Amino acid sequence: MTTRSVVVKVGTSSVTDATGGVDHSVLGDLAGDVVSLMRQGWEVVVVTSGAITAGWAEVGGGRSRPHDAVTLQAVSAVGQPLLMSAWRDAFARQGVAVGQVLLAPLDFSNRGQYLHARSTLAALKSLGVVPIVNENDAVADAEIRFGDNDRIAALVANLVAASHLVLLTDTEGLFTADPRLDPGATLIEEVRAFDATLLALAGSSISGVGSGGMASKLAAAHMATWSGVTTVIAPARASAPLSSSLAETSGFGTIFRPRPERLSARKAWIAFAVASTGTVSINQGALQALEHHGRSLLRVGVTGHTGTFEDGDAVDVLGPLGEVVAKGLVRVGAENFDDGDDVVIHRDDLVLLRRP
C-alpha cells in the first residue's frame, strides 16, 4: 500500500457560495494545500461535489436543489464543466494540471471496470496530474446511483490503496450531539471503533444544499477504516485543512483509526462496492465454521435463501437471528441452489462483517 497517498472529498456546501455558484476562493486555497502536499511527496486524488448546485445556479434556479431525477441530471450536465473549469484554473495557478474522472456504480461493481478505473487514476498520478473525481450524475441510473460522494470517496480510497481519506465539509467534525441544538456538544477528536451509539450521532446535512450529511460521512469512514484507511472529517474552510488533517493537528476534525486487520483490496471490493442481490441464511454450526475456523460456506449449513441471484453475484449472509454476519460471492444461482456445488461461498470470496 502507498504510505503517502490521500483521497480528499470536498462537499457541495464547501465548493459553492451563497448564490450556488462555484466558490473560486475556496478552490484556490484547497489547490494550494494539495500542491504543497504533492511537493512533500504525497499522491492526492480529489473527489468533488457541487455540479448540481452550480448548474442549478447557472440556469437561474437559485440556492435550493431540485428534487426530480431528470432535472437533477440535466443541471448536473450544466454544472460539471463549470466545476471542472474552476478546478482547472485553481490548479493552473499552482502550475499543476488536472484530469476529470466521472465514475458510476458499475465502475466499482464490475471487476473489469474497477481495474480499468484504477489504471486510469494511476496513470494520471504518474503524469503529475491531479485526478478530479465526481459521480457521473448526468447519465447515472437514478435507481442505482450512489447519490453522495462520501461513499465514492471511500471506494476510491480503496481503489488507489490510499493510506488516508479526508472528508472536508461544513462542520468542524463529529460532535457528541448536534451542535445546532446543544450548545454543550463537544468535538470527538478520535474514534477507534464503530458502534450503534456512534452512528446515532449522525444528523441531517446542516447546509441543506448537498446530498450527504454526517450519516453518509460516518458510513464512508466505516467503509474506509475496514479497508485500512485512516479517515478524517474536518472543516473545508479552515486554513490548510488537508495538511492539518494529515498532521493530526490537535483539536482539528475527527480522526477515525483503521481496523487492525485490514481487508485485502478484493475483499473490500466485495464488501462495499458490489450490491447484494439476495440473502443466504445459515445455522449456528455454519456461523461457527465461518467465524472461528475460516471455512467456506457449505450447503449443509444453509437454512434458506431469498432473491434472484446468479452464480458470481454478491449476497448477504444472515445468521440464526437474521443479522447480517458476512457477505460473499455465491458459486450457485438461486434457481438451481439445491443442485449445485456443495460450496455455496468459497472462503476466498467471503467477507466476515461482525469482527470488531
Where are these regions (language model features)?
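C-terminal catalytic "cap/lid" subdomain
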Residues: 1-97, 101-356
